[in-house]
């Protein structure tokens, strides 16, 4: 986390990574996420895309090595071995993440839930690849959780 001085006040500014996984409407989703993050005093460090579980794992490892917060957009509507829920479940089975570290994010506008996964000082937020759903899932509760987790 770095501090940036802006005019007469000090602002905390934190960067996070964004990974698109089997996502559509990526440009619209990126704009929607940026808008939500700006309100938190956050920005996007890097944007990458993945179309396979292995590539997603590699990108996630890279992202978590440089950022404490990573957003994954897409893949929630897929089932089987390529579905994001299945991929994250397998990846996290070898970590210290417990069921209490995973929160389901309700989607008022669609069928797919989002997920918030916290392990130590790092967090992964998985959201659907529909901008209107993504924006609505950025509820006051999620914003508050992110702010509290990172001291924003």
What are these regions (language model features)?
Residues 2, 27-31, 39, 58, ...:
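Intrinsic structural disorder
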Residues 3-13:
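Short, Lys/Arg-enriched N-terminal segments with co-localized hydrophobic residues
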Residues 11-52:
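Glycine-rich phosphate/diphosphate-binding loop of Rossmann-like nucleotide-binding domains
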Residues 21-24, 50-61, 74-75, 127-128:
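Structural motif
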Residues 61, 65-70, 78-151:
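Proline/glycine-rich low-complexity loops and linkers
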